[in-house]
Amino acid sequence: MHSRISKADKGSIKISGKEITELKYDELNNIRVRIGFMFQNGALYDSMSVRQNLKFTLKHHTRDLSDEEIENEIIEALESVGLKESIDKMPAELSGGMQKRIALARALIIKPEIILYDEPTSGLDTITSREISELILDVQKKYKTSSIIITHDMACAKITGNRILILKEGEIIAEGTYAELEKSKDEWVRSFFI
């Protein structure tokens, strides 16, 4: 929604003070290139190696890099998620946690200002979920990115969230820090924190 892949039913979405629901195509594309995505299932191309997945993304967003510059960007992105040694592996050879890390490297390779995470810890064990949550924090600090994290994993929300919004039927019903929401007067909101 934040990159206006789909149309908003109601409300407004502002990025850097610009109402994106009203932007023309070219203006919207200028916003989109500033946003990285980490999809719930990783969304890696099965027929491409890790290197090829990252190269495809980089070439799609940046047309003026030499092959050497592209390779350096790929290595830097993989090093930032601790998976440089997986550069020539196929997605099927990677664990779920490794696929999530590669998906994050793919989001990072375009040097976004904002990263949108869709259920970054979904389908992972508790230890790997915590590692991914901590990696999100590391990425925020190292690359100075803002993060929007969509999650049902309250442990992830506690680790990564400065502000948490709770939605019910598409409406925001609560907003605050983890500690504030944990003590909410609303029993339904508190039920998420048990």
Locate each region found by the language model.
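Helix-to-loop junction immediately C-terminal to a conserved catalytic motif
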Residues: 3
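Conserved catalytic motifs of ABC-family nucleotide-binding domains
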Residues: 111
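Conserved ABC transporter NBD signature motif
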Residues: 11-19
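Catalytic Walker B motif of ABC-type/P-loop ATPase nucleotide-binding domains
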Residues: 115-118
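Conserved ABC ATPase "signature" region
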Residues: 18-19, 67-85
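Conserved ABC ATPase signature
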Residues: 90-94, 98
